[in-house]
């Protein structure tokens, strides 16, 4: 693990504060196993297939969680260049340890601010299950695409997934759980819908694609 630099280490958003070491210890089975499959109705296999379709050998993971999907994905090269970027140190440390065999470089930064890191650009950037935790609606959240775009090579792809509130089929558990998460400010997606996501992506990227699986939008766009 190469600890390249620390930027904006203060964690003030509830969506970040929720990711404690204890939470991360049960995150894979509770959130990715139960919630994603039964409540959001987007099985992990769909996310993994999306990863494998877009992952490059020169990759930046943003909002790293526990590294679950990267750990189960297949890079197109034996020795990929992998970087991890997150505001939460707990997430960075857990994921870097899990993916230590790739010797990832880690960056601690707030993607809501311009990202001032000195690094060669990447061929792929993933923003998986991050947007629904960011404050505001897509006109405000969309600035993260502007901040990440300079980190992509020409032709590079930004992809990811986010849980939407509007324009998706939400069953009773999804409505109740989403309301609770928004009340606790772990989520901030009460105004998030597909049209808003598409508009935010198209403002900064080309060849934008958005597909819905349950309550989840799988999205991609290129520089």
Q: Where are the model-predicted features located?
A:
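Short glycine-dipeptide loop
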Residues: 152-158
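Core SAM-dependent methyltransferase catalytic element
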Residues: 203-223
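A short acidic, Gly/Pro-enriched loop at the edge of an enzyme's catalytic core
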Residues: 115-125
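Class I SAM-dependent methyltransferase SAM/SAH-binding core
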Residues: 58-114
């Amino acid at each position: 693990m190469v600890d390249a630099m620390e930027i904006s280490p203060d964690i003030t958003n509830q969506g970040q504060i929720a990711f404690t070491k204890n939470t991360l210890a049960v995150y894979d089975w509770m959130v990715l196993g139960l919630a994603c499959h039964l409540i959001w109705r987007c099985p992990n296999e769909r996310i993994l297939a999306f990863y494998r379709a877009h992952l490059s050998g020169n990759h930046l993971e943003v909002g790293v969680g526990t590294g679950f999907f990267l750990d189960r994905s297949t890079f197109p090269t034996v020795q990929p260049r992998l970087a991890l970027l997150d505001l939460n140190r707990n997430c960075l440390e857990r994921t870097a340890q899990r993916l230590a065999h790739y010797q990832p470089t880690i960056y601690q930064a707030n993607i809501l601010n311009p990202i001032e890191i000195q690094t060669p650009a990447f061929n792929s950037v993933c923003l998986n299950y991050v947007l629904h935790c960011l404050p505001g609606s897509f006109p405000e959240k969309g600035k993260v695409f502007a901040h990440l775009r300079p980190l992509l090579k020409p032709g590079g792809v930004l992809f990811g997934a986010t849980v939407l509130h509007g324009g998706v089929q939400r069953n009773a558990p999804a409505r109740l759980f989403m309301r609770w998460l928004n009340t606790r400010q772990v989520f901030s997606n009460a105004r998030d819908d597909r049209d808003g996501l598409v508009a935010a992506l198209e403002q900064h990227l080309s060849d934008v694609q958005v597909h819905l699986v349950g309550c989840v939008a799988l999205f991609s766009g290129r520089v």
